[in-house]
Amino acid sequence: MEEKQWWTFTFGYGQQHEGMYVEIYGTFKSARRKMFERYGAKWAFQYNEKEWRDWESKRPYYIVESLLEKIDEEGES
């Protein structure tokens, strides 16, 4: 059974929520499913906790991202 964790989803250039991200707590598949339910296919990447920390530490200074929504499947939003 896959362990639950926080997943971060980003939006790409030219998308409605460009420069923002969503955090969802769940398994890889359940978090992805929730993201599709909320935003369809209009988002860019899915990161696990380690990948997101790595991206944040290497992200160019001119790329600013803001939290749009945080969803805990067990507690919902």
State where each predicted segment sits.
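Short aromatic-glycine-(Arg/Gly/Cys) micro-motifs in beta-strand/loop hairpins
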Residues: 2-19
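Serine/threonine-rich, low-complexity intrinsically disordered segments
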Residues: 10-12, 29, 73
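A short, exposed loop/beta-hairpin motif centered on an aromatic-Gly-Thr core
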Residues: 16-30
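Short, mixed-charge low-complexity intrinsically disordered segments
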Residues: 38-77
